[in-house]
Regions:
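Structural/interface elements that position substrates and couple domains in central-metabolism enzymes
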Residues: 1-171
Length: 171
């Protein structure tokens, strides 16, 4: 039973990354994707088995630049999570160092949005609900994509602003 749960979780992470790639015209190569959240759940800095690690890995492999904001997870933790995954997958040290040049971490969310092609919500932090999404939209390339992996934002409001908004499990 648990093996099936793990397989389904892995499939969902893969599907989320694929949804981002497909909606950004089948490539994220050279594109800036902003991640909101890295921890596996809100109110913690625990990143064990966080979906963000696997989604980032897939997008980086496709050439994306990942810009990350999480209120509790440090840059060194984020980079060590990715390095650990890549080492497990047998990726060379040189290749890992190259991949890490595609990862950017911010202390303030507002700094992560400028010139983003897409935003992916990967942790359900309360603060994300209270952002000024109108201002964020103005900072982004158009069409501005928002992928809500936690279904915490108001779809109607975001679409009204102009976002191409996608929720997990919904169209």
């Amino acid at each position: 039973y648990w093996e099936q749960v793990i397989k389904l979780n892995d499939y969902q992470k893969h599907r989320f990354a694929k949804k981002i790639i497909n909606n950004l015209f089948n490539t994220v190569n050279g594109k800036k994707i902003t991640f909101l959240g890295w921890a596996f759940k809100k109110d913690t800095n625990d990143t064990r088995e966080s979906a963000a690690i696997y989604v980032a890995d897939q997008l980086i492999e496709d050439g994306a630049n990942i810009h990350i904001y999480d209120p509790k997870v440090t840059e060194s933790k984020i980079k060590s999570d990715l390095t650990y995954l890549w080492e497990l997958n047998g990726i060379s040290e040189n290749r890992i160092l190259k991949k890490l040049t595609q990862v950017f971490v911010y202390d303030k969310a507002i700094d992560a949005f400028k010139d983003s092609h897409a935003i992916a919500v990967l942790t359900e932090w309360e603060e994300f609900k209270n952002y000024n999404w109108k201002n964020i939209y103005k900072e982004m390339y158009k069409p501005a994509f928002l992928f809500d992996g936690r279904n915490i934002l108001c779809a109607e409001e975001l679409r009204e602003i102009g976002f191409e908004y996608y929720q997990i499990g919904k169209i």
